[in-house]
Amino acid sequence: MSSQLEALRRHTTVVADTGDFEAMRALRPTDATTNPSLILKAVQKEAYRPLLQQVVRDHRGAPLAELTDRLLVAFGREILNIVPGRVSTEVDARLSFDTRATVERGRGLIALYEAAGIPRERVLIKTASTWEGIQAARLLQADGIRCNLTLLFSLPQAVACADAGVQLISPFVGRIYDWYKKAAGADWVEAERAGANDPGVQSVTEIYRYYKRHGITTEIMGASFRNKGQILALAGCDLLTISPELLAELDGAQGDVPVRLTRDDEAGEVPARRPADEVWFRTELNANAMATEKLAEGIRLFSADAIKLDALLGGAAGR
């Protein structure tokens, strides 16, 4: 009998959610995703310190923003030597409300990849699913730069991403689960909110059905998992990005993985497709306390780690 990881691969593209490219080798993901927090965690390991030092040594006089982007691309290049597919590299979260700056940084990241001989088709530029981030992705996509919209917690965000024609979205599962569990307090019963009843799983399922029912080609990559059950409950999703720890857990477990999401699923009603204008987007997002709070929190956390990464690079450069 095959492992659950192998069984999952039959239905879903498996992606590694880490900056630790050495951890990817044994688990053979197709793609990989990174973010500022994952890169910060990786460069604090002794094994990756030479990569940081080389970037600083080769570009010592460069501004911190450029050093950061060069470090991200250095990690991305190493990852692409391991995975056969794509890597997602994130624009600085501090630019989440600045469309123009996000576009400029996204173009800059792609230019660095292409200068290193990496075709743009192997790179996804990650931006936050704010209104500004989504509009930046619209412009980048028009330039032939494929985008991954992250920090996505609600159907209105997904609708706006589809309207912008983005390549891929990353709806979060675990952070939605965290919010509802905290809100429920002592009333939360884990067994009753597992599997298809998990609020994070339900959110991704809602988005998946909306996209497939309306023939939307934007890829859906479930992200931010807290346990193996959440992953198995989304088998059949286009892609799932999974931490090395949970990948290893799936690899060590034997058994079949039934398909939970299918393109021809007719279960349940879905809203009519609509264009996403700014007033509608902000109104709908504001009405969803969970999505509003988790989006803001995610930007704060990624921004804080970007500041720490700046400090680490600045220290290495003697500034």
UniProtKB/Swiss-Prot annotation:
Recorded metabolic or biological pathway in which this protein acts: Carbohydrate degradation; pentose phosphate pathway; D-glyceraldehyde 3-phosphate and beta-D-fructose 6-phosphate from D-ribose 5-phosphate and D-xylulose 5-phosphate (non-oxidative stage): step 2/3
GO cellular component: cytoplasm
Taxonomy, superkingdom: Bacteria
GO BP terms in the entry: carbohydrate metabolic process; pentose-phosphate shunt
Major localisation: cytoplasm
Main EC class the enzyme belongs to: transferase
Family label: Belongs to the transaldolase family. Type 1 subfamily.
Quaternary structure, from the entry: Homodimer.
E.C. number: 2.2.1.2
Function: Transaldolase is important for the balance of metabolites in the pentose-phosphate pathway.
Entries under PROSITE patterns matching the protein: TRANSALDOLASE_1
Active site: K126
Phylogenetic placement of the source organism: Bacteria, Pseudomonadati, Pseudomonadota, Betaproteobacteria, Burkholderiales
InterPro entries: Aldolase_TIM (IPR013785), TAL/FSA (IPR001585), Transaldolase_1 (IPR004730), Transaldolase_AS (IPR018225)
Classification via Pfam families: TAL_FSA
Reactions catalysed, as given in the entry: D-sedoheptulose 7-phosphate + D-glyceraldehyde 3-phosphate = D-erythrose 4-phosphate + beta-D-fructose 6-phosphate
The gene coding this protein: tal
Record has Cytoplasm as a keyword: yes
GO molecular function: transaldolase activity
Protein's cellular compartments: Cytoplasm
UniProt keyword annotations, A-Z: Cytoplasm, Pentose shunt, Schiff base, Transferase
Coiled-coil intervals, chain numbering: none
Protein name (record): Transaldolase
